[in-house]
Structures are given as structure tokens and as C-alpha cells.
Amino acid sequence: LNLEYVLPEDIERRSFEIIESELHGREFPEKIKPVMYRVIHTTADFDYADNLCFSENAVDAALELLKNGAVIVTDTNMAKAGINKTALAKLGCEALCFMSDPETAEAAKLSGTTRAAASVDRAANLGKPVIFACGNAPTALIRLYEHITAGDFSPAFVIGVPVGFVNVVQSKELIMSTGVPHIVARGRKGGSNVAAAIVNALLYMLTR
């Protein structure tokens, strides 16, 4: 075994060099590349080079929202924890997750729905532009779709990367059909770590 001796501060840079090498010269639009590479770096999964889908001018739209202090709402505390708080603070943004709140649990119980869907309803009442970052619950994306098509709430941006088997593929396709600016991982793959990685990639484009 030939170990690489890399200084701690150089590990991320070296990782991105390896990603670049293993993509064998594939070209990606300049705005998309940092997001794509950050997700691959987080997961070590090169499938994202093919299944990560961006709506037209998605990155520009997301960056503009972040520059203007949009609220990021996540569907898991894990995704919220993974978002870089220093970068958030530099831009005057905040990340929220309603999943563990008693109010969310009570609303879900009363309406016979999931806490993820109830979290979306709470996000709809924030009264400010929302970037919804979903890495776990397809029911959150489905509830977003219901709000969008009903015309009563539309998130400013959707990061749709839930992972799993039940309604995961379908929920992502629904979001992609709405016209709302989005970054979606088509298929079954995703996760809270992927949602956080996408948010961080966008934040770093503005703060590093």
C-alpha cells in the first residue's frame, strides 16, 4: 500500500484533485462544477455527476437568495447541523429545522400527516423567501408540490435530494415539473449530508 502523506490543510484540495482526475476530463458548466464536486467529495459517489439536475440558472438564483438573507429550512436536524454556520453568519442567513418541535408533532397528529409535511406548512408561514433543503423525507417534497400547485406557497428554491425507496423518485420528479428553481438528485440517491453539501457549496461560492 502506498499511503499519501498530505498535510491536514491540504486534504480537501487533494480530494478535489482526485475527483477531477477520476472524472476523466468531463466538462461541467462553471457555476455547476463547485456544487457537483462538493457532493461527490461528501459521498465519494460519482453517480452524482449524472443524476444531479439543475434548473435553468439554478446556481445564480440560489446565490442571489443567499446574498439577500434567505432562510434555509431543512427536513432533518442532521442537514441543519451540516451547514457551515460561519458562512451563514457572513451572509446574514439562518438555517431552521422544525422537525423536533412539539408544535410540528402536534400539527402532524391533528392533520394525520408526517412531521416533514407539517414542517413544510410551518415554512410556508415564515413570510420570507425560503430555500427548502430536503435530504430525507419525500413527503416534504410532495407537500411542497401541493402548496405550489395550489398557489398558496412557493419556496424560492428547492434542494430536493431525499434518499430511499418509497415515493422518493416520484417526489423529485414532481418538484422538477413545477418551474420552481431547484437542484435535484434524480433517482433514489441523496441524503441529509448531500443536502448540507449543496448548501455549503453555494455558501462557499460567496464567502471563500
PLM-predicted stretches and their roles:
Residues 1-30:
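Charged, compositionally biased N-terminal leader segments and the immediate start
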Residues 27-41:
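N-terminal glycine-rich anion-binding loops that anchor highly charged ligand groups
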Residues 156-165:
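ADP-ribose/adenylate-binding Rossmann-like module
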Residues 166-208:
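C-terminal functional extensions of proteins
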Residues 88-126:
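Long, charge-dense
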Residues 50-65:
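A short, well-structured juxtamembrane/interface segment
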Residues 79-82, 138-144, 165-169, 191-195:
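Short glycine/serine/threonine-rich phosphate/pyrophosphate-binding segments
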Residues 75, 159-160, 198:
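Buried hydrophobic positions in well-ordered alpha/beta secondary-structure cores of metabolic enzymes
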